[in-house]
């Protein structure tokens, strides 16, 4: 599989895993009778997403040098920030977005190396 396709898939699966972990953490606010089942469901989805992401990551490392692939994984910061705003209503400050922009600029610089 093409490394340009694998990298976004790894990032997306990692982002999904992070969102599921956040959802599992929020399940502790549920009534005690439902808490454990909901938490375990979200954690199971997180483990599957992160596990698939790890397998694709291993495949990606067969195609790209670690020094190129790993910095590009920083795109996860962008995805998780956007998803946190969309799904959880979390606010990001201007300083946070400037940091995200710096990460995106770094990703652009890394892509020129390929």
From Swiss-Prot:
The entry lists its GO molecular-function terms as: carbohydrate derivative transmembrane transporter activity
What organism does the record attribute this protein to? Yersinia pseudotuberculosis serotype O:3 (strain YPIII)
InterPro entries membership: EamA_dom, Flippase_ArnE, Small_drug/metabolite_transptr
Membrane topology per the record? Multi-pass membrane protein
List locations, semicolon-separated. Cell inner membrane
Q: Which residues form the EamA domain?
A: 43-112
Cellular component GO terms held in the UniProt record: plasma membrane
Instruction: Please give the subunit comment from the record.
Output: Heterodimer of ArnE and ArnF.
Gene Ontology biological process:
lipid A biosynthetic process; lipopolysaccharide biosynthetic process
Q: Where mainly found?
A: membrane
Membrane-spanning residues: 38-58, 64-84, 94-114
Record keywords = Cell inner membrane, Cell membrane, Lipid A biosynthesis, Lipid biosynthesis, Lipid metabolism, Lipopolysaccharide biosynthesis, Membrane, Transmembrane, Transmembrane helix, Transport
Name of the protein described by the UniProt record: Probable 4-amino-4-deoxy-L-arabinose-phosphoundecaprenol flippase subunit ArnE
Which Gene3D superfamilies does UniProt cross-reference here?
Answer: 1.10.3730.20
User: Pfam families per the record?
Assistant: EamA
* Function comment: Translocates 4-amino-4-deoxy-L-arabinose-phosphoundecaprenol (alpha-L-Ara4N-phosphoundecaprenol) from the cytoplasmic to the periplasmic side of the inner membrane.
């Amino acid at each position: 599989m093409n490394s340009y396709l694998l990298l976004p898939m790894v990032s997306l699966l990692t982002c999904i895993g992070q969102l599921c972990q956040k959802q599992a953490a929020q399940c502790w606010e549920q009534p005690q009778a439902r808490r454990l089942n909901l938490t375990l469901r979200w954690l199971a989805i997180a483990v599957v997403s992160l596990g698939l992401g790890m397998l694709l990551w291993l495949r990606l490392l067969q195609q790209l040098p670690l020094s190129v692939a790993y910095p590009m994984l920083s795109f996860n910061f962008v995805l998780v920030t956007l998803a946190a705003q969309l799904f959880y209503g979390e606010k990001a400050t201007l300083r946070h977005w400037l940091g995200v922009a710096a990460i995106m600029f770094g990703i652009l610089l890394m892509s020129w190396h390929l």
